[in-house]
A protein has these predicted regions:
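Charged, compositionally biased boundary regions
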Residues: 1-184
């Protein structure tokens, strides 16, 4: 990490993170007790929020697998498309609506690829509803293809970073990078 320019404040090592044990600081010799990650407050909070915990990365990768593509929509009046799509995403993030329109993925894909400011506006919406945003943007990305999928995966990755779910953030970023051919 130091070679990459990342400041390392402290190093701790442990034999196992799935069972109780001991950590050691190799620089100072200090030690302490560890407990399984499954017993942590973060794990309890993630489960309470509906997260699925699994021991296998492959199970997490499947959460991003493409599903039936969203149906096509006529763009029509761009201003109406922007306002209704933003409203529908806001409703999904705030829980005002449990129903997600079948065309929301398509409309969101059009918005986030049409202008960087619209894509960035989606990130701004996610700031107050980070956990919901991870679910919404993962779902939207699963229904999209090509560049809209890569942009939705990028938004999902950022949302996962906001809740410190670095594994899912990394998976979304890896999938996005694998689709680099669709980037301009």
């Amino acid at each position: 990490l130091t070679e990459a320019g990342i400041t390392v404040r402290r190093r701790l090592t442990t034999r196992d993170v799935t069972a109780a044990g001991t950590w050691i600081d190799p620089d100072t010799g200090a030690t302490g007790t560890t407990y399984p990650y499954t017993d942590s407050l973060l794990t309890a909070q993630r489960i309470h929020d509906g997260a699925i915990l699994t021991a296998r990365r492959e199970d997490l990768v499947r959460e991003f697998d493409p599903i039936t593509p969203a149906p096509a929509v006529a763009v029509g009046d761009h201003a109406v498309l922007v306002s209704t799509t933003m409203e529908d995403i806001t409703d999904a993030l705030t829980g005002a609506s449990r129903y997600i329109s079948a065309t929301l993925s398509t409309r969101a894909g059009i918005l986030i690829t049409s202008h960087p400011a619209l894509r960035d506006a989606m990130l701004h919406l996610a700031l107050d509803h980070e956990r919901a945003a991870t679910n919404v943007w993962t779902h939207l990305a699963r229904q999209l293809r090509g560049r809209p999928r890569t942009d939705a995966l990028t938004i999902a990755a950022v949302c996962y970073c906001l809740i410190t779910d670095t594994v899912r953030a990394g998976i979304a970023a890896d999938l996005d990078a694998a689709l680099a051919e669709y980037r301009e």
